[in-house]
């Protein structure tokens, strides 16, 4: 009727613009009428493809072909918001919802059935034939068989009403509400990686629709923000932007494939090219972005790895979860077992081995008690134990003082100092501190990155660290772990009879010195050419531990040079010093005889000799004798040995002195079957080889080797050499203190000091004096070493003469020689003295070569 009425207008009377506008209105209204009467079209798939599928016996389901097949008696409804919509290619929300909801096929069908035909308002005869999930879009296509009493339009309307009513009953209906839309087009069921978007792209296969037509067709699915009609460049593509994803998804699935006035609409999601904020930031702001990235990585590494490292350091100190004997449980079990076995041995009269460890230490029991008392004191504990190499500092502390201590951390500076490469140093430091995990290879990577970034941006990232800073970070992390161990049982509030008392951390640590860990730093020398920073870092770290009163610190050192380094770290702290020296002759003899008691008895017994049975521990206790346990063992050994054997042992012990490591080596050799004199000779020979390799070989600097040989000659004749005698020696004149201290640090000699001034020079250990004599008495070796020493002296004196001759040359050209007569006489005397030394050395070399 509308079309008939519009054709009766008097078109001839209209102006041209009005005529054009009128024609446009008529055309738009005519197309709107066609739009209202639009019928769903059929998405055409090549019949040849369908025939091929049928011939092959393959299925033609929507999942396999992308096309939904239905009859005229069926209606197709799209339900949205049934699944979680895919937000990315990986779709993590789908996996999350699988844990919270039952999304099986039967559960989804039951849900669709209850929404479309609920029990309180059913559609009688409605049958759910099939469901096709579109999980990427979060919806489901459902095919229903229309009951005979209803038309398709009535069924669609009832399903929409029931779905809206049923899905709004939930308290969270704003988020879980489901909408149902009849499918007007022919949807394409695809699972391509085309993520849903709020903008849909409409491709017109035929004349394009106007904005009014597009709005009328797509508005029912959601609020439209904007419509982008076809342009002159692309006249068959339009875009519709929705406010929500649900509107765009429903429009795409319900309208795609519809045919309106010979125009088929194909709808897809707009392919969003997302400008990534982070990538754009890195691309456009490189100088800022790269340092920020590395800073974030560093913060992340600290947050993740530092707690693990603190835990591993605590484990290193406490051995709480360790299966070694340092574990507290194993220590208690070992103590219980040892005490039980000791009681059984005592009851049966068996020997007890515990006394054998004490004889050498009888003269040091007082020092052990002092050290234990210092660890139990409430004031800050900073102990320095000094003694020559091999004097038993380590055993005194670790075996006799801290054997039953729970929390002990032992650090060996020698392993750190001797690390030649940075990765090796970091591994050794981490191993001793328990610092795990550590990645030494990162240093090389960060170094390359730092250079690369510096080339790109002109500035360093600061990501690469030196080994000094990394070692300092290890110590800082260790400090936090030590503090946590010390305050493990600390409680801020303590309940008493009068109420609650607030206890400070300082007061708790002052009252419980046993809770503080003990840090033992061994071989602390104070100076080193390689990795010398270790001493400063350790001393500063130890000073901080003592100042915070969270640990006891014990330094083991061989020289007094370390005191200067420690004084710099703790200038106002008074150190507790413990000086260890060699055992006396009597105690050395008692130790060796007590250790050899059982061996001598069973050795003579096996040879068939008649020897007195040693008394058991039980018999010794029952005798109630005034003699000590050590004296008893020594007397038994003296009874077993004859006078000649005792004299042989005494003669062998004379060169060994009281150095504990040498005494232990001597005992092991005798127990292995060597005679005392034979054991001593082999030890002297071994010491001489060690001296030759370290100080007298061809690989050693000739000047140092000559200085060492001169001291060897002097110390073989005299046990002690005053330092003043060395000052005038030719090879020591230039820098006597430097040469002597270098030989001391290398372990050839030891020097006593008086208020820092060098006084007396001795061999590094008593056995070395016998080794010096052995080297001097070896004719072939002594001849080679003596010749090398004399040649060095000749070269030294020759160099001095050349220097004086250079000074004489300009003086000889002066006309009046009387002006410089005094200087000429001085230089002449010097040259004559050096010539005399050279003549004497050459004469000795000549005699040695005969």
UniProtKB/Swiss-Prot annotation:
It holds the Pfam family RNA12. InterPro entries: Mt_escape_2_C (IPR018850), Nucleotide-bd_a/b_plait_sf (IPR012677), P-loop_NTPase (IPR027417), RBD_domain_sf (IPR035979), RRM_dom (IPR000504), Yme2_C (IPR039627), Yme2_RRM (IPR034260). The lineage of its organism: Eukaryota, Fungi, Dikarya, Ascomycota, Saccharomycotina. This is Mitochondrial escape protein 2. It is a single-pass membrane protein. Residues 198-272 form the RRM domain. Residues 47-64 have a biased composition (Polar residues). Plays a role in maintaining the mitochondrial genome and in controlling the mtDNA escape. Involved in the regulation of mtDNA nucleotide structure and number. May have a dispensable role in early maturation of pre-rRNA. Residues 44-66, 607-633 are annotated as: Disordered. It is found in: Mitochondrion inner membrane. GO terms for biological process: mitochondrial genome maintenance; mRNA processing. SMART domains: RRM.
